[in-house]
Amino acid sequence: MNLSEISYRRVVVKLGTSVLTSGSLKLDKAHMVELARQMACLMKAGVEVVLCTSGAIAAGKEHLGYPQLPDTIASKQLLAAVGQSQLILAWSQLFSIYGLHVGQLLLTRADLHDRERYLNARDSLNALLNNGIIPIINENDAVATAEIKVGDNDNLSARAALLCDADLLILLTDQKGLFDADPRKNPDAKLITEVQNIDDSLRMLAGGAVSGLGTGGMATKLEAADIARRAGVEVVIASGHHKDVIQNVVCAKPVGTHFTALEHPLESRKQWILAGPKARGQVVLDTGAITAVTQKGRSLLSKGIIEVNGLFQRGDTIELVDTKGKVYAKGMSRYGSLDVSKIAGKHSDNIEEILGYDYGDAVVHRNDMVVL
């Protein structure tokens, strides 16, 4: 690889189940060899690589001889527990061919929700990278429940990119990228090569495109791309079976769909608000409050709140939505849901009179808010 061609220095590569199995029921070891070779070439060229890998459940099924198990969470956790060790062993053996070591990081949303644990995860990730070790990240499916799951490795890889301050996230799938129609149904569908803004029309376009295996489809990849690009990370969605795809993307060659990063990315704490804590509830805003928050950079005041959904505590992350449920922002509430219900629609000057105390005029301060 020509060093002068390299456009990025720290890269997160996400491999979906459909890429690792090539559409079969077991890991495609031959293809994993090729992917490991590409990543090893990057490492040798001075590019730091983080691997976010799916495939634990598929590996577990294969190792146990495809057992007949009930379709329950416990069965999936069993398969993940068995398969994760097989998956990390396979990657360790493959990278050892090139004299490279790997380190395993298993995460849940709980590790990202708490600010201290989030920073600890970041320190661990950076320690591996700084010592020339390839971090291999997966969700800890053996213990994760619906409440603490990130949900898919697309979103997990975006959060990993934020954790390690990567400048590129590569999402490899069984599709060539994002198309203007479903290529499996429409032979005239055209590949979208460049995306500078993710809007509702693009989200609708991606909504129906789902990979054959795994938990992620094109919609989750779009969510991941949106998180990453807001933090200043460029994103490429491409086919994991395209020849030399990883190297070509890192050398900025035209492959897949490229999402440009925001020119002015979010600062670190707001990155955490966006990607770390799960929203515990919602507040419904009137049109004036939506305009103030999204267009004028204002804090959310109690006067602009129409309704409160869900139960949340002071300091929890909540979503700011309109009457139709569209999410406009995400932020940390300075008041619990019961208090917000009491002061909703009331002037900020009356908060102390209503509650007997106050934590400031803003329900969500602009410094604790990310506009989406």
Curated annotation (Swiss-Prot):
Family matches, as Pfam families: AA_kinase, PUA
Principal EC category: transferase
Subcellular location: Cytoplasm
GO cellular component, as recorded: cytosol
Gene3D superfamilies according to UniProt: Acetylglutamate kinase-like, PUA domain
Main location: cytoplasm
Catalysed reactions, semicolon-separated: L-glutamate + ATP = L-glutamyl 5-phosphate + ADP
Binding residue positions for ATP: 14, 173-174, 215-221
GO biological-process terms attached to the record: L-proline biosynthetic process
Any one GO MF annotation of this record: ATP binding
Residues that, per the record, bind substrate: 54, 141, 153
Keywords: Amino-acid biosynthesis, ATP-binding, Cytoplasm, Kinase, Nucleotide-binding, Proline biosynthesis, Transferase
SUPFAM superfamilies: Carbamate kinase-like (SSF53633), PUA domain-like (SSF88697)
Assigned EC number: 2.7.2.11
Domain PUA residue range list: 280-358
Domain of life: Bacteria
Pathway annotation: Amino-acid biosynthesis; L-proline biosynthesis; L-glutamate 5-semialdehyde from L-glutamate: step 1/2
InterPro entries cross-referenced by the UniProt entry: AceGlu_kinase-like_sf (IPR036393), Asp/Glu/Uridylate_kinase (IPR001048), G5K_ProB (IPR041739), Glu/AcGlu_kinase (IPR001057), Glu_5kinase (IPR011529), Glu_5kinase/COase_Synthase (IPR005715), Glutamate_5-kinase_CS (IPR019797), PUA (IPR002478)
HAMAP family per the UniProt record, alphabetical: ProB (MF_00456)
Function: Catalyzes the transfer of a phosphate group to glutamate to form L-glutamate 5-phosphate.
Family: Belongs to the glutamate 5-kinase family.
Protein's UniProt name: Glutamate 5-kinase
Lineage, broadest ranks: Bacteria, Pseudomonadati, Pseudomonadota, Gammaproteobacteria, Alteromonadales
Gene symbol of the encoding locus: proB
